[in-house]
């Protein structure tokens, strides 16, 4: 398994993310009509949850917000909210919530 994943990332991986954040800050999302699922932890220590909440409030399309309640067995930074390696106790619930959301938006 370890052949296909890592817990260590080079700092150069942050450059594209920083560029994306800069671009997004300059955009207006109030006219967006695409539905969105916002699935995150209010205890995220990597991304300021209040900034996520502020972004959600500007989303023009229909949206659903799910605040993930992390456990002691999950990502200690409450940032990676699903996945068998970092947040194994969240994966099944995340799969169920996302699947339900997709089915729900397809009904309409």
Where are these regions (language model features)?
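Generic structural signal for well-ordered, non-membrane alpha-helical segments
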Residues: 6, 10, 48, 87, ...
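Short alpha-helix in the alpha/beta-hydrolase fold that links the catalytic acid
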Residues: 34, 47-61, 67-70
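Short beta-strand/loop motif that positions the catalytic acidic residue
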Residues: 32, 37-40, 44
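Structured segments of extracytoplasmic/periplasmic soluble domains
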Residues: 20-23, 58, 101-105
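Catalytic active-site module of serine/aspartate enzymes centered on a nucleophile-bearing elbow/loop
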Residues: 69-108
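Alpha-helical membrane-targeting segments
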Residues: 1-14, 45, 84
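Extracytoplasmic/secreted proteins, especially bacterial periplasmic and envelope-associated proteins
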Residues: 12, 16, 51-54, 93, ...
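Active-site nucleophile elbow and catalytic-triad environment of alpha/beta-hydrolase enzymes
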Residues: 11-29, 34
């Amino acid at each position: 398994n370890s052949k296909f994943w890592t817990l260590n990332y080079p700092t150069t991986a942050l450059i594209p993310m920083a560029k994306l954040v800069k671009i997004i800050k300059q955009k207006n999302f109030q006219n967006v009509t695409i539905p969105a699922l916002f699935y995150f932890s209010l205890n995220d220590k990597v991304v300021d949850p209040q900034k996520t909440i502020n972004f959600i409030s500007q989303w023009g399309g229909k949206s659903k917000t799910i605040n993930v309640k992390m456990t002691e067995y999950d990502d200690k930074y409450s940032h990676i909210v699903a996945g068998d390696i970092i947040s194994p106790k969240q994966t099944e619930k995340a799969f169920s919530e996302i699947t339900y959301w997709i089915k729900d938006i397809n009904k309409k």
